[in-house]
Amino acid sequence: MAPKAEKKPAAKKPAEEEPAAEKAEKAPAGKKPKAEKRLPAGKGEKGSGEGKKAGRKKGKKSVETYKIYIFKVLKQVHPDIGISSKAMSIMNSFINDIFEKLAGESAKLARYNKKPTITSREIQTAVRLVLPGELAKHAVSEGTKAVTKFTSS
C-alpha cells in the first residue's frame, strides 16, 4: 500500500503542475493589460509613491468636526461635567445642520439681491430668519462682537 500512496501523490503533483503551468500562462496574459493600465496612471516609480500617499490620504481623510470647540464651551459653562462620545456626535451633527441652514439661507439672500458675494449682512439676516426669537438676538450680538474683534486685530 505504501507504494500506491507514493504513486498517487507523485501522479497528482505533475497533474497539479500542468494546470498551474496553464494558469501561469493564462494569468500573465490577463495581468499584462492590467499592468499596462496601471503604468500610465501610476507613471512608474513615482506612481508607487503616489499610490502610497493616496492610500495615506484615504486613511487620514480630514473630517472637520467641532468637537474641540464644543468641549471648550462645555468646560467654560460647566467645568466639572463631561460629555459622552454619542452626545458629542449629536452636538457636532447639530452644529453642522445649523451651519448648513445658515449657508443655504445666506446664499438665497445673495441670489435675491443679485449679489455674487455672501457678506456679514447676509449671514446676519440668515441668522434672524433661521433662529427663533431671543436666540437670534444673542447670536447676532455675539457674531457682531466676533467680527469687530477680528477686524480690529
Swiss-Prot record:
Can be acetylated to form H2BK6ac and H2BK33ac. Residues 1-28, 36-53 have a biased composition (Basic and acidic residues). This is Histone H2B.6. GO terms for molecular function: DNA binding; protein heterodimerization activity; structural constituent of chromatin. The nucleosome is a histone octamer containing two molecules each of H2A, H2B, H3 and H4 assembled in one H3-H4 heterotetramer and two H2A-H2B heterodimers. The octamer wraps approximately 147 bp of DNA. It holds the Pfam family Histone. There is a cross-link at K149 (Glycyl lysine isopeptide (Lys-Gly) (interchain with G-Cter in ubiquitin)). Belongs to the histone H2B family. PROSITE patterns: HISTONE_H2B. Keywords: Acetylation, Chromosome, DNA-binding, Isopeptide bond, Nucleosome core, Nucleus, Ubl conjugation. Gene3D superfamilies: Histone, subunit A (1.10.20.10). It comes from the Eukaryota. The modification N6-acetyllysine is found at K7, K37. InterPro entries: Histone-fold, Histone_H2A/H2B/H3, Histone_H2B, HISTONE_H2B_site. GO terms for cellular component: nucleosome; nucleus. The keyword Ubl conjugation applies.
